Each structure stands twice: as structure tokens, then as C-alpha cells.
Amino acid sequence: AFESAWRLSRIHDRHELHELLREDPELCLERRSAPERLFFSLRMQAFARNAIGSLHEAMESIAIDSCTFRSPEIVLILGESYNKHHAALYGYPLPTTPRLSQEEAAGRLYPFTDVVSPANFTVQAFASQDRQTAWCDTPLFPALFRRAGYDTLMFDNQTTFTLENDDVWDQEIRHFLYHPRLSPQLFTHCNADKYPFDEGLLADFDRQDLRFRNPHRLTIFHLMGQHVAYRNRFPAEAGYFTADSIPEYSTSGLRRSRDERRIVADYDNAVRYND
């Protein structure tokens, strides 16, 4: 217990913190006692303040010489908890991605098949073997588009812009991405509401569409996607699979109970709804 606090106390900057968490990713899980939790929180708040300051400086330093706007309308969709092994697009036997598969067949979609990530956790996935730079030392990409003359529209279903929501990931996203010092550098518009299902973002987009006359736009949709609990990620009428749709034995030969197959069916329904 006290070893964790001592190790954290020896860290002087976020680079050392990243190295420590890379070496010992379970470190933060060891803070069981109230004093440990308080100490950890205070240290993390200090590092967060430094990270926000670094991000602000990095984005202030952006210089765009010119932009041809060869792609005037760009849409980026960020999914969540998406496992390609449950996507028919990548060979899954159930029809979880009928629309994506149709787009691929028509030659309008290119599925990547050889992508390697250093981690399955968002921030750690930014790590680069060739460039030992902390993620907060370089500009976030929406700021580049904004500085180049694009309107940057953000429709996010993982956070709200009020203080009533106490979800941990909601607070983390709001603390960095929508920090009052950083958000104006990143986005022309952010949605104000959160929706039970991701299609609510599309209705929100339709309501806002006429407000922005700039022909050059980057629109980002950040979905709740297939985040747990899976049964909450699709409306009842969108249910397509049931426990009976899922094989009793997994591809690795493990027998699945009916409850386990129902959970898999819920996930597959979330994938299909996401599609």
C-alpha cells in the first residue's frame, strides 16, 4: 500500500508517470485505503493540470500555411468497445453488419485487416514505438482542422455538458476534451444533450445542420456503441438475435450457459444496431 504512494511521490512529470503505468498498469488498482485514494487523486489532478497546459500550448502553436479543401465534407465516426471478431464484415458467421458488408461489396468501404495497436485502452493506444512523445504534447487533430478553416462539429453520446452526471468516463472526457480552455480551440459546436441510443445524435445533427453555412466541415460522431451493458445499447425493436442464435460452444470449444449466450446475443444486437 505505502509502496504505491512512495512510487507516485517520486514522479516529477507525466513522462515518468506514463513509464510507471506502462511498467505497472495495476498500480492504480492498489489504492484501497482512503489515504491512498486521496493521495492518488491529488497527484493525478496535478498531472491533469499540467497535461491541459501542455495541450493548450501545443494547440496555440499550430501554424497552417494553406488548405486546398480537397475533402470539404469529412465525417468521422468513433465507435466504442467494437470487437471485429463479432463483425460479419470480418468473417463472423452471424449477420451483424449487413450495411457495412453491402458498402464493401459496392466498393465504397475499405476494411483494414492488418492493424496493430500497442494496447486496448484508449490513451495507451496512442503510444508510438518510433516517437516517444506524450499524447498531450502534440495538438489534437480537430484543432488542426479548425485552424485550417473548417467548422468542427462534435456530437458526443458519451458525455454531457452539465455537472449532474457522475459517470467516471463522462467526467474524464469532459475534464479534458471539453475543458473550457481547450474546447474553443477544438470545436465550432458541441451537442448539449446525451441520448439513450446513438441514433439520437443523428436527429441532433439534422437540427443543427442548417446553422452552419461553411462548406468545409469536419463532423465527429462519438458513439456509446457497444459499451456495457450491451442490452442497453439498442432499442427493443432493434433486437435481432436471441440466446438461441448463439452456438452453445464457442470457437475455442468452451461450453456457454444460456445466460452467457444471451449476453453474447445482446452484444451482437448492439453491433447490428451500430451498423
Predicted regions, residues:
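Conserved small/aromatic sequence motifs within transmembrane helices
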Residues: 243-266
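Surface-exposed cleft-lining segments at the edges of enzyme active sites
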Residues: 186-194, 258-271
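Metal-dependent active-site segment of extracytoplasmic phospho-/sulfohydrolases and closely related
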Residues: 75, 269-275
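Active-site-proximal alpha/beta segments of enzymes that process anionic O-linked groups
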Residues: 5-251
